[in-house]
Amino acid sequence: MRTAPMLQFPLDEYEQRINNLYSVLEKGGFTAALLTNEDNLRYFCDYRSALWNNEYESPAMLVAVPGRLVLVTSTRTVQTALATCCLDEGDIFAYDGFGEAACPEALAPAIVDTLRKLGAVSGKLGTEIGPVTRMRITYNDRAAIFDALPGLESVDVSMDLLGLRQIKSPREIDVMRQNCRIAVDAFKIAADKVVLGETTEEDFYHNYAAASYDLGADDFSLQLVVEFGPDRMQPNGVAGPRVYSDPDWCIFADSGPTLKGYASDMIRMAKLAPPTAEQQRLMDIVLGCHALVVPMIKPGTTFKEVVEASDNYMREKGADGFCMTIGLLGHGFGQDVHEPPMITLSTEGCFKKGMVFTLEPTLLHPTEGQFAIENNYTVTEDGCELLTPQLQGFYIPERS
């Protein structure tokens, strides 16, 4: 392994991740694994390329066997691999036309040749075919690989890999802590720029994105959800041309930027006028839910316990009829905005040290609109740390 010029973590970070990958292969009895998704390539070797945004091309794939990991890419993009990827040059296999839209016939033979070179011609081939993943490969290419190597059997390895990625290292948590702060600070900057009768939802989005980059973020994995007014209850809707035309309207924003490939996912709310009594009552219900369940969370607390407590609280407050998060209170996140574990009544398992997750109690009131505060947390030795401490409740910009 080598320290590539653009490598984003120290080499020992990737060494540990790759060793964990080898352990998964050995424990599961896998002959090899074929990894095609951007998140996995970035996680295990830091390979990066703008071509991931092109749905018609596959810039690179990883093939792993116990004790060795190789990157398969095109001869035209070897320099990209050498600039970003931690693997030695001898572990970068380049093939003419690999993954290129103009040479679709090149991909499957390149993967077959790589597997043969690594001695992986029979047994279990780990592939990304789990319930929350999919392979970045066409059906025909996948069929061609297994036609050429009939001794291989496709078996899901994605959930094992997501299990590795659930537990963040201290370095990952440091990056996510920084990015989560950027996410909320950018909301404040965008809210401070709202002008009654002029600012649109799209303007807010643009101001938020500009502030995020100015504060140090480097990308977005999802569009920012922006909603003005009580009649715009569109969970995960996109910003539109609506103008902020009533100071009693709420400003609602959801998601956040990324930093070094790691997401943030906050919800914050603002207004240009103080909240009405009913708006404050609804916000207090949301904040009370966080106050109730967060002290419960520590290593060993089950997801079900936390969701049951939240659901019972919403019933006691008479909000269960318009609470969107009954039965589902949050989710893990990392390189993706939504990753396991899902924090639901039906999710087996418990919180573990190093998990990073959101809690987003959300009310969809029929006349008042959408109310939520989504906070980001990480599980510590004996509790959890709030990664988004700023702006709890309504933010009211000061006007001179």
Regions found by a protein language model. Name each.
Residues 1-400:
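Active-site neighborhoods and metal-handling regions in enzymes and metal-associated proteins
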